[in-house]
Amino acid sequence: MKTQKYNYGTAILSAFEYLLKNYKETFIIGQGLWSPWYVGNTMTDLDKKFGKDRVIDTPVSESATTGAAIGASLVGMKPIVVHPRMDFMLYAMDAIVNQAAKWSHMFGGQAHPGVTIRSIINRGGEQGAQHSQALHAWFAHIPGLRVVMP
């Protein structure tokens, strides 16, 4: 078995490539996906390889982006939402906490919003206090959400 070393950015890019290549229902949606300033090297050329209909760069609207992804997941799509700043995920709290986290239980297991949300913390040294919080532990306390991180 061949082993390969990855840094975080390359590992994320490799995982996204694998998912987009092997699962046609997967798409990635979020702000700044086509800009390395927003997402570093984690999205390099994915829009060119898989098309802008599967790597969707959105306007600044965390709530709308997250809500659209959750809705798409209910009809069989496998969306990945990228929030380039975890702090601004707070604008999407209704969609995350009151919808995605609860629907499976609210509808007797008939609705399974299978959405993955990736959030980026402190994209560099220039971020201020309101751009660099780590809210993982806070999200981990919400029933129905699964929080994973390296």
Each model region followed by its residue ranges:
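Thiamine diphosphate
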Residues: 1-150
